[in-house]
Amino acid sequence: MQRMRNGSSATSPGIVQYTTEVLFLDLWLRPDLAPRDRSLVTVSALFASGQVAQITYHLNRAMDNALTQEQAGEVITHLAFYAGWPNAFSALPLVKDVFEKRPH
């Protein structure tokens, strides 16, 4: 989140404010979905919409929130059928990189 603040605050302070106050300090803290589930939904939405630039950050957060490598791999397989094979293959190098850089 600090990287987002540093890179965007001068360009669009409003987006930083809404991201911090509404997205992270409200939506992500609502009690009806666990952080792992919210992370899984977020990664799936990014994957399905082809927004691969954000996958690394959010997949790391999902794994911080207890998503395993095996589960992440299964999510990609499942989403390939619903969101398209090109999206799956676009995301695979990023997912592989996340897996390799995380402690085992």
Where are each of the predicted segments found?
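Short, solvent-exposed interaction modules
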Residues: L46-S49, D64
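Short, structured motif recognition centered on aromatic/hydrophobic residues
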Residues: D37-L46, V75-I76
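Short amphipathic alpha-helical surface patches that mediate protein-protein
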Residues: T77-A80, K96
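Mid-chain, well-packed structural core segment of small domains
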Residues: A53-E70
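Short, hydrophobic/aromatic alpha-helical segments in well-folded domains
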Residues: H58, V75-H78
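Acidic, glycine/proline-rich low-complexity segments that act as flexible tails and inter-domain linkers
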Residues: M1-R36, N60, D64, A88-H104
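Short helix-capping/linker segments at secondary-structure and domain boundaries
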Residues: S49-Y57, N87-F89
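C-terminal structural segments of small proteins and small subunits
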Residues: A80-P86
